[in-house]
Curated annotation (Swiss-Prot):
Keywords: Ribonucleoprotein, Ribosomal protein, RNA-binding, rRNA-binding. The keyword Ribosomal protein applies. Forms part of the ribosomal stalk, playing a central role in the interaction of the ribosome with GTP-bound translation factors. NCBIfam families: PRK00099.1-1. InterPro entries: Ribosomal_uL10, Ribosomal_uL10-like_sf, Ribosomal_uL10_bac, Ribosomal_uL10_bac_type. GO terms for cellular component: ribonucleoprotein complex; ribosome. This is Large ribosomal subunit protein uL10. Part of the ribosomal stalk of the 50S ribosomal subunit. The N-terminus interacts with L11 and the large rRNA to form the base of the stalk. The C-terminus forms an elongated spine to which L12 dimers bind in a sequential fashion forming a multimeric L10(L12)X complex. The gene is rplJ. The lineage of its organism: Bacteria, Pseudomonadati, Pseudomonadota, Gammaproteobacteria, Thiotrichales. The keyword Ribosomal protein applies.
Length: 172
């Protein structure tokens, strides 16, 4: 069924709004998937905070125009599903990677982040990106390490003095 111009404008506006707040994007070919498999993918996307939409390529091009994901414009060919990571930069890649394990017909085409276009070979790298909490925990550990080491060194001085006095006392 053909879309009316109002419907097309609404779709472009919705996708453009989601793109404006996205951290990363992934595009995949969904040919060969059943309706139940696509429904499962959509459910997993909702659970992981990923915006997922099957959108016509021309409408997607209009939605990403002027954004950091404009680099995807030339990659939009054929029937594609667009996934946008909203909270975590690697969420869409993780979703696609996990889904691709069980569904051979599902093929990731491109990934984009910070205005750069990446091929499907970078899917594993994107999927391994830490969550915000993991990144903050790592940063905190790095920042605490010198302080912790300094405190241990300060505590070692009185401990050594006590051991020296104990050794002197034992020798007499």
């Amino acid at each position: 069924m053909a879309l009316r111009i109002e419907d097309k404008k609404a779709i472009v506006a919705e996708v453009a709004e989601q793109v404006s707040s996205a951290l990363s994007a992934a595009v995949a070919d969904y040919r060969g998937l059943t309706v139940n498999q696509m429904t499962s993918l959509r459910k997993q996307a909702r659970e992981s905070g990923v915006y997922l939409r099957v959108v016509r390529n021309n409408l997607a091009r209009l939605a990403i125009k002027g954004t950091e994901f404009e680099c995807l414009a030339d990659a939009l060919k054929g029937p594609l599903v667009l996934a946008l990571s909203k909270d975590e930069p690697g969420a869409a890649a993780k979703l696609f990677k996990n889904f691709q394990k069980d569904h051979n017909a599902f093929e990731v085409k491109n990934l984009a982040m910070s205005g750069e276009l990446f091929g499907p070979e970078k899917l594993d790298d994107f999927a391994k990106l830490p969550t915000r909490e993991e990144a903050l925990a790592t940063l905190l550990n790095i920042m605490q390490a010198p302080v912790t080491k300094f405190v241990r060194t300060l505590n070692e001085i009185p401990s050594q003095a006590v051991r020296v006095f104990a050794a002197v006392g034992d020798s007499k």
